[in-house]
Amino acid sequence: MKQHRFASHTPEERRRLSNLGHIVEGLLLGAVGVLALLESTGVASWAATAWPILILVAGVLLLILIYPRHPFSDWPAIWRDAQQQQHTIMAAAIAVAGVAELLRGLGSVWGYVWPGVMLLIGGMFLIHEQHGTSAAAAKAVWQHRILGLTAIIAGLLRAAEVGTGSSPLAILWPLVLLAAAAQLVLYREPEGAFEIGHGHT
């Protein structure tokens, strides 16, 4: 894997890499939503194992996109970057959720990890750090807040489904997750992102 210094990326490269990351994660979470629907509707029993594996893959892949592509000496700087710190926490939480879903057979408490992670990620999107011009940051913040609210709704629905065993909720939360996945796939960093300054509104 070719490595690049974290600080060497141009704004254009950072926008391109960010867009790619959003698309890849969106496609993976979209696949999770589809597989969860196949499980909940009884179409494919094997999907019950497949979608937790995909959650784990999504978390690990995001960590790979953030860290191993850069020299180990750059990792502390990556962690100190507020936006990348949030991405790191999200990625680790997603990976943990994948493992927890695979362990659900050991106890029902594991079933609350994935919805908890969706709530965590949704909350982090509401306060997501953005780099760039004021106009670019404001636009990105607005898009991430909508995404965050969608993730929170999906998490609440999944938690309610785990607690009640409701069949309608088992169908509803993957649909909301698909809406969040679509937002990720369609997201593009606005012009001016990563150009100057940083912050959120």
Residue ranges and their predicted role:
Residues 1-201:
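Peripheral, non-catalytic segments of secretory and membrane proteins
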